[in-house]
Amino acid sequence: MSPKAQDPQVRSALIEAAARLLAEHGPDALTTRRLATEVGTSTMAVYTYFAGMEELRREVAREGFRRLAAYLDAVPDSDDPVYDLSALGGAYMTNAFTNFDLYRFMFLENPEDDDVGEGTFERLVRGVQRAMEAGRFEKSDPLPAATQLWVMAHGVVTLHKAGCLTLDETLTTMRDMALNLFTGFGDDKDAAIESMTKATELFLGAALPPTAEAV
């Protein structure tokens, strides 16, 4: 089959099915025969779109980061950088809930072109830098703060999907931890709550439960 004759829907279906098999059953479950059965195509179709299983695994990870990037890119910069960071957190959670099979695998397989993953993290680093430049956070190296925010979001989402936290507990925990981090970075508590509330209403459609006191 020539490249022009390739069907992007089949390629996407192969990636989705591979992500599901990898996430639910591990790498040993990813075979051409099982993948073809999942998608309802021939084993040769796998090699039409990918050079082999290793390339497919890398492409699954790349696709996960591409989808995350699309959600993050949908958050424009505003004049409130803490709102923007909160909105990025909402976008991160929405992507994880929507594309969880890809999400579970994308951090386990390191794509050869690291720019795919690094670009998404750089968006968070830039968001922290903007908050520092605006005087909301104390000025310092933005990398540690961005790392803490990412670890928070990733950990809470993972615990929710593992059944350890209900959705309400997930949202409340995320909100309270973010508030503690924002104020720890130097933001005024009331200003942080106002920024976070606006972002919550944008991504979740309603305000979260009353905010707990920052530690």
Feature names for model-found ranges:
Residues 108, 114, 133-180, 185-204, ...:
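Hydrophobic/aromatic-rich alpha-helical bundle segments in the mid-to-C-terminal region
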